[in-house]
Amino acid sequence: MSKIEKITKQLQHEQADAAWITTPLNVFYFTGYRSEPHERLFALLITANGDQTLYCPKMEVEEVKNSPFEGKIIGYLDTENPFEIDPLSFNKLLIESEHLTVKRQRELTQNFGVQHYGDIDQTIKELRNIKNESEIENIREAAKLADKCIEIGTEFLKVGVTEREVVNHIENEIKKFGVSEMSFDTMVLFGDHAASPHGTPGERKLVKDEYVLFDLGVIYNHYCSDMTRTVKFGTPSEEAQTIYNIVLEAETNAIEAIRAGVPLQDIDKIARDIISDAGYGDYFPHRLGHGLGLEEHEYQDVSSTNSNLLEAGMVITIEPGIYVPNVAGVRIEDDILVTENGYEILTHYDK
């Protein structure tokens, strides 16, 4: 069943007339056309019989025509009301309620005469959760480039270099490999600064005998990677090395349990129990991982409260961590493709 067929099936189930999709990444997912419209209306309308209409600024119409999208295009000028170009009326509309603004919903009510609304968010999340071969290949390439970023960063380490200098070096050098965008702000943290899980790289200078945490990702053909490595610079303290070994054991055991049909919460529990049994449970304050795809954080999460089952075609991260103030912060993260009988690790830089 195609993506559009799954949407129309949901529309029929909800007795809705159409779905209205406005999140740029979701529109891209269904159309193959990517836009950053800012304040302008950019939306995909999918009716219960499968008809598709893309609303976009008139200046983008030619680009849409050159994209994979084969539906109707309504291009509008900034001075026009796009809803008046082809007046429509719907009794019930499914919307992305997690994203659509109140202002935009009022426009739908006024212009389409919508009487009832429902949610399409979960259906789209579940569609994006299972990747096809093309998506997997894009993520695989993004993961290779993330590996290269870690290599670039570790080779640049030297006494006196700052966190920010390492970040800048990674992002400048990776452009030579065709990368134009990172998945998120690159994180490089030295020593106990890494005890802040979402710390901001700054002017801290590297000294001998501490760990360096890299957390980064690359976008390749619209798809993200997201990996973390904590690498030695010299010989860190005994406690810091103990923490590292515990985190590595937790990650290794969690990954080895991955296969289709296993509850996500079971994977989280494996890693969390290892860290807790070692006495560091209070220093592991986040879920074990999350989905990965067009965004660096996607449905589903790998957490103690998620009883949903792993499915073949999912791509998730596994990223246990221990963060002890004034001692060390260690996190190790890999991107994992779930298969019917196990898993494939997509990120490969040494641990």
Curated annotation (Swiss-Prot):
Q: Which Gene3D superfamilies match?
A: Creatinase/methionine aminopeptidase superfamily, Creatinase/prolidase N-terminal domain
Membrane spanning residue stretches = none
Q: Where does Mn(2+) 1 bind?
A: D226, H290, E319, E333
Co-factor(s): Mn(2+)
The annotation note on the cofactor reads:
Binds 2 manganese ions per subunit.
InterPro entries per UniProt: Creatin/AminoP/Spt16_N, Creatinase/aminopeptidase-like, Creatinase_N, Pept_M24, Peptidase_M24B, Peptidase_M24B_aminopep-P_CS
SUPFAM superfamilies per record: Creatinase/aminopeptidase, Creatinase/prolidase N-terminal domain
Q: Is-annotated flag, keyword Secreted? A: no
Q: Which GO terms describe its molecular function?
A: hydrolase activity; metal ion binding
Binding positions for Mn(2+) 2? Answer: D215, D226, E333
Report the domain of life of the source organism: Bacteria
EC number of the protein: 3.4.-.-
Protein keywords: Hydrolase, Manganese, Metal-binding
PANTHER family per record: AMINOPEPTIDASE, DIPEPTIDASE YKVY-RELATED
Q: Which family does it belong to?
A: Belongs to the peptidase M24B family.
What is the protein's given name?
Uncharacterized peptidase SH1217
